[in-house]
Amino acid sequence: MTLTACGSTSQGTAGAVPRIADVGTRAFEYNTLSDLTTHASAVVVAEPTGKTSTKPFPYGDAKSAPTPYTQMRIVKVVAGVLTAKEIDVVTPGDDISTGKSALLTSKSYLLFLTPAMYAANDPAGGYAVVGGPAGTYAQQGTADQYVKVDTESPALPASIKLGATAIPAISKSETQILNEGPH
């Protein structure tokens, strides 16, 4: 797999919350934080480095759209295990206000992460956000306050305050999640 670096190096701004247009159907509806952590290997606070990349789809033809990634710096692991200091995250969508990766809009995010994969035991490299927008919360206000980005999961909490909102424990390792395959 090849990574292609793209031009943006600007970081998001505090208080900005991306708006992601939901143009597809969802295979799974997330209603609780437990739903998110059931499919996650880690919950982290991460900041965009400003770098983006793409990976070609290995099973497609030359016309297949590449998968866009945003590089994130890990600030804190809230639940689960993640030892890397920087990771590539599959972009959960584009911010309809900027046309760029939604992960470049805010200064900091609370992300429910799972290994990115094509199929069971076929990792794509990097991480994906559980449920795309559903597992994405953007910092707004104080450094420990995060608001829901997803507009299509009304049952999820509208905001999460670190230290005050209970984040359910992670029950599966990356290996276990890879063995199960994508959700």
Where are these regions (language model features)?
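A mature extracytoplasmic/lumenal domain signature
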Residues: 48-50, 74-76, 91-93, 115, ...
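OB-fold (S1/OB) nucleic-acid-binding surfaces
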Residues: 58-91
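C-terminal motif of bacterial Sec signal peptides marking the signal peptidase cleavage site
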Residues: 2-5
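Soluble periplasmic/extracytoplasmic beta-strand elements of cell-envelope proteins
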Residues: 43-47, 69-73, 88, 110-112
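Extracellular/periplasmic catalytic domains that process cell-envelope and extracellular macromolecules
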Residues: 38, 64, 81-82, 102-105
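Netrin-like (NTR/C345C) domain of secreted extracellular proteins
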Residues: 7-15, 97-183
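Extracytoplasmic low-complexity, Pro/Thr/Ser/Ala/Gly-rich segments
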Residues: 11-68, 170, 174-183
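Sec/Tat-exported extracytoplasmic proteins
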Residues: 37-40, 52, 76, 113, ...
